[in-house]
Amino acid sequence: IGSYHIVYNEALHKRMKKESSLSHYNSMNVLSMHALIGAYSDEGSQWVDELREVLTENVKYACKFIRKNLPGVSVQQPEGTYMLFLDCEEYCRCSGRTLDEVKKAGYEVGVVWQDGRPFHGAHHIRMNLALPMEKVIIAMDRLKEYVFI
């Protein structure tokens, strides 16, 4: 919420609208509405700039860590979001674990993430990196030590 699509191709526009309607994540709510108003105000401008710096560093750190330390897990550095989409297909195949087992192992060590299947990722997990860097580091270390073993 708070982003805009400019789609000139009518067929692509219809497809984009159809896909975005399949999830409640594309619906405005009271909190997101006020956050959007604040972000576009003069007072919100500096805060948004600082936030973008933090989120960019979080994403860079997490992607580099995952590529180096979590064999069988792949990730693409996102453009314009703080959500990672971890592809666990190779890890699950090699380890014999299901995606549900991997998700549960993360929850058990305090890493709260989201099933990627509702977002068209059959073997994916969504991870939100909108938090302080120290928490990102702790989460990555826990994934390496306890989950993707």
What are these regions (language model features)?
Residues 1-149:
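PLP-dependent class I/II
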